[in-house]
């Protein structure tokens, strides 16, 4: 979810994602912080503003600036500073406080904090015509998603299906996942290619987010240059439930490799 829209200068944010549990707060508020830093020699003025967002079926962030949803964190958020200048590679700490958190609904609430440079930079691009110039307007914008879980929240991941099909001389896997409960599920994991009970190949799967009560589908190409024979693809994914416990989701699918693949 950490996104940069054509950054002109190298800007780093730590952490790039914030997840909070309101049930662990001793009061009616939560406080968190993140730091922003640019390269040495860069002087950039930034402004901050929050937006509500939803999670799409592809695990991406979809901004919804004018949302009145109950799970919108913006009405509860205060942040300091709301504008600052990065200079000489020195980091800037931004503090975010959420008040009246007992009014938040059960489950997950969210917002994204955008950091955007105040003044756009102009870049002249080379042109084949000396009488015509092309000007590019460049802005840097970073987004830090912030999630707050509160009350009775549940995180349940499900591995619904794993299929392998032949497409254009490639073997393609299609993976279907879903999440129950009222809070997102974030998973990571690996895939194994097995033949005759022996591990042939192993590779990392993309980490992704499934929205609460949402579905997610992913597809990819299996490793090539496999010998002919019968294989098993075993996918092992891990996520954390509402108690912070690691849970595994495992699915297997058989496939064959022939001379035509």
Predicted regions, residues:
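Short edge beta-strand/loop segments characteristic of extracellular beta-sandwich folds
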Residues: 33-37, 97, 172-180, 221
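Surface-exposed binding patches on compact interaction domains or structured appendages
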Residues: 12-14, 42-96, 195-200
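Beta-sheet-dominated interaction scaffolds and their linkers
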Residues: 9-42, 83, 157-170
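Short proline/glycine- and polar residue-rich coil/turn motifs
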Residues: 84-92, 207-216, 225, 242-245
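A short beta-turn/strand-edge loop motif at beta-sheet boundaries
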Residues: 41-44, 181-186
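Terminal connector regions
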Residues: 47-54, 99-147, 226-261
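C-terminal segment of classical bacterial N-terminal signal peptides
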Residues: 1-7
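Ligand-binding face of N-terminal immunoglobulin V-set domains in extracellular IgSF glycoproteins
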Residues: 31-35, 78-116
């Amino acid at each position: 979810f950490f996104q940069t829209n054509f950054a002109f200068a190298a800007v780093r944010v730590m952490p790039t994602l914030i997840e909070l549990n309101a049930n662990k707060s001793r009061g009616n508020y939560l406080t968190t912080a993140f730091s922003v830093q640019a390269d040495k020699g860069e002087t950039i003025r930034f402004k901050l503003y929050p937006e509500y967002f939803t999670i799409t079926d592809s695990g991406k962030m979809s901004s919804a600036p004018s949302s009145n949803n109950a799970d919108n964190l913006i009405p509860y958020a205060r942040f300091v500073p709301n504008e600052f200048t990065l200079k000489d590679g020195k980091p800037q700490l931004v503090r975010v406080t959420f008040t009246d958190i007992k009014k938040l609904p059960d489950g997950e609430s969210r917002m994204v904090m955008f950091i955007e440079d105040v003044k756009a930079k102009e870049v002249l691009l080379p042109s084949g015509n000396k009488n015509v110039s092309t000007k590019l307007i460049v802005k840097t914008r970073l987004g830090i998603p912030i999630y707050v879980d509160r009350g009775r929240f549940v995180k349940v991941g499900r591995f619904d299906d794993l299929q392998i099909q032949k497409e254009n001389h490639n073997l393609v896997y299609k993976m279907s996942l879903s999440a129950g409960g009222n809070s997102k599920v974030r998973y990571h994991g690996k895939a194994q290619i097995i033949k005759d009970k022996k591990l042939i190949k192993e590779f990392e799967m993309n980490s992704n987010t499934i929205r609460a009560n949402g579905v997610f589908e992913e597809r990819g190409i299996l490793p090539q240059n496999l010998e002919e024979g019968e294989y098993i693809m075993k996918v092992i994914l891990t996520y954390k439930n509402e108690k912070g416990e690691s849970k595994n989701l495992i699915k297997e699918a058989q496939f064959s490799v022939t001379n035509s693949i």
